[in-house]
């Protein structure tokens, strides 16, 4: 019993000592001054904290990337228009440079091109407006058609109203002309180059467009030109290699081969072919 009481007494004393030590450490930490952050020190002084350089740099770099992405989406390039200079003979378009006017164009076709400067967005179609919408807007509605039919049925063929009505103006492409520029897509002949360019650029207003034809034609001609340049480079490289191989072959021909050396040695070592000196002959 006494031993148990002593053990309990010792354990109680040890627990009290540890509790006192822990309280002293906490008091020391509370009493010691804590280091203040630079922002807190600046706020106590009443000064405005300076902006960090890292934030400004990151914002500047993000602005640059946005601007570059916008610039990449636009590309300035020229569009090529393919045409042929023709002259009219009895309503038939014949070649500009043919001596005989009755000669057909298929025998001596000569296609020319002109660049039309414009800004084209990369990855976008040539025209955002569909052809169907344009045709539906230009075509008259059902009510307008009925009204026109009624007016035609009411008017008699011999009435003065029909005689006084002006005739419709013939389109420019039906007017006979001596010479002009023929579009290679739709084969229509235009009087001036400006009219041809306007037709290619804004032909969608008329219900159809030759814009896509000229774009694809330019791509095909560009591919053919690149292939021809590659073939020429390959031919030049092949000719250079042949020229380098020719002197090497000549050097090999000039040097005696091992077979020739072996034949010479065999003839010199032949017992029947012994050459005597003039002294031996005199003796």
Swiss-Prot record:
Subcellular location: Nucleus
Polar residues biased stretches: 127-138
Residue ranges, compositional bias (Acidic residues): 228-246
Zinc finger (C2H2-type): 181-205
Annotated disulfide bonds: none
GO cellular component, one term: nucleus
GO molecular function (one): DNA binding
Basic and acidic residues compositional bias, start-end: 142-153
Record InterPro entries: Spt46-like
Modified residues (Phosphothreonine): 170
Phosphoprotein is among the record's keywords: yes
An example Gene Ontology biological process: transcription by RNA polymerase II
Region (Disordered): 1-54, 123-171, 223-283
Chief place where the protein resides: nucleus
Modified residues annotated as Phosphoserine in this record: 268
UniProt entry keywords in alphabetical sequence: Activator, DNA-binding, Metal-binding, Nucleus, Phosphoprotein, Transcription, Transcription regulation, Zinc, Zinc-finger
Any Pfam family: Spt46
Family listed: Belongs to the FAM170 family.
Function: Acts as a nuclear transcription factor that positively regulates the expression of heat shock genes. Binds to heat shock promoter elements (HSE).
UniProt comment concerning the protein's domains: The N-terminus is necessary for nuclear localization. The C-terminus is necessary for transcriptional activity.
Designated name of the protein: Protein FAM170A
Organism: Macaca fascicularis (Crab-eating macaque)
């Amino acid at each position: 019993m006494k031993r148990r009481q002593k053990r309990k007494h010792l354990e109680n004393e040890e627990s009290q000592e540890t509790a006192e030590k822990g309280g002293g450490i906490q008091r020391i930490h509370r009493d010691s001054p804590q280091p203040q952050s630079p922002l807190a020190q600046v706020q106590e002084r009443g000064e405005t904290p300076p902006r960090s350089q890292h934030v400004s740099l990151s914002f500047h770099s993000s602005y640059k990337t946005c601007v570059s992405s916008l610039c990449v989406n636009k590309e300035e390039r020229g569009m090529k228009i393919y045409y042929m200079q023709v002259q009219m003979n009895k309503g038939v378009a014949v070649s500009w440079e043919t001596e005989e006017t009755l000669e057909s164009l298929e025998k001596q076709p000569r296609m020319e091109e002109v660049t039309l400067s414009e800004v084209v967005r990369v990855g976008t179609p040539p025209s955002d407006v569909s052809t169907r919408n344009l045709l539906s807007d230009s075509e008259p509605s059902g009510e307008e058609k009925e009204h026109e039919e009624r007016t035609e049925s009411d008017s008699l063929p011999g009435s003065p109203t029909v005689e006084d009505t002006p005739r419709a103006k013939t389109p420019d492409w039906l007017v006979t002309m001596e010479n002009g520029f023929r579009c290679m897509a739709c084969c229509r002949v235009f009087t001036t180059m400006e009219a041809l360019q306007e037709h290619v650029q804004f032909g969608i207003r008329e219900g159809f467009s030759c814009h896509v034809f000229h774009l694809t034609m330019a791509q095909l001609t560009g591919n053919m030109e690149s292939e021809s340049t590659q073939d020429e480079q390959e031919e030049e490289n092949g000719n250079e290699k042949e020229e380098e191989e020719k002197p090497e072959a000549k050097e090999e021909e000039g040097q005696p081969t091992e077979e020739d050396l072996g034949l010479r040695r065999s003839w010199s070592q032949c017992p029947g072919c012994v050459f005597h000196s003039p002294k031996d002959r005199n003796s």
